[in-house]
């Protein structure tokens, strides 16, 4: 399978009053077309910085990121970011939020927005405003707004971190269902090992700062994945051992 995303020799440091702060050591990895990769690591190790570099929002000091074999030095039009903070416009309805990113001349914008609202379980809420929705429903709006523009790559930075455990689990199940219907390459940053196992095809474990990839785990289990199955429990234990737990 062809590589969709190639990260080669990435390094990054920031200037501080106490001198350079080395955040990212040398990191190399590839993500195949249609693959779901999760990146986990200790708090403050540079996960978000790494994602911002991969997504094109931060320039590395060394190395390069290539999408479809072409080096990128800024955000790729083929990708879109879903963050923990959220990006729903409070003055727009669900339908209007979904239509916002579509080209002004896109035919049937409303029909397309309504289709994706239905896909993420928001049928009947198209005319609702964000303040009328729960946290889980708002996250569904964000997901639908990302998907409606048909990105080839989804960059996700702790997208479910603000949700309660049950809602987070429901959203994981919804996301896997959608990805079974539509092909997207995904890069997920998360502190939640179970979330990574539940969603990903491969998991990269980052070291403490300056971050490097200290371990890679394949996740060969079919979906749906049961978090209490012996295989999943065993994989979780192996990943946690990388953190000394």
Where are these regions (language model features)?
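The feature captures the beta-strand-to-loop junction immediately N-terminal to the Walker
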Residues: 40-42
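Conserved ABC ATPase "signature" region
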Residues: 107-125, 176-177
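ABC-type ATPase nucleotide-binding domains, specifically the catalytic core motifs of the NBD
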Residues: 15-17, 92, 96-111, 119
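A short, proline-enriched helix->beta-strand linker immediately N-terminal to the Walker B motif
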Residues: 148-152
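Helix-to-loop junction immediately C-terminal to a conserved catalytic motif
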Residues: 55
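Conserved ABC transporter NBD signature motif
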Residues: 63-75
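Conserved ABC ATPase signature
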Residues: 129-133, 137
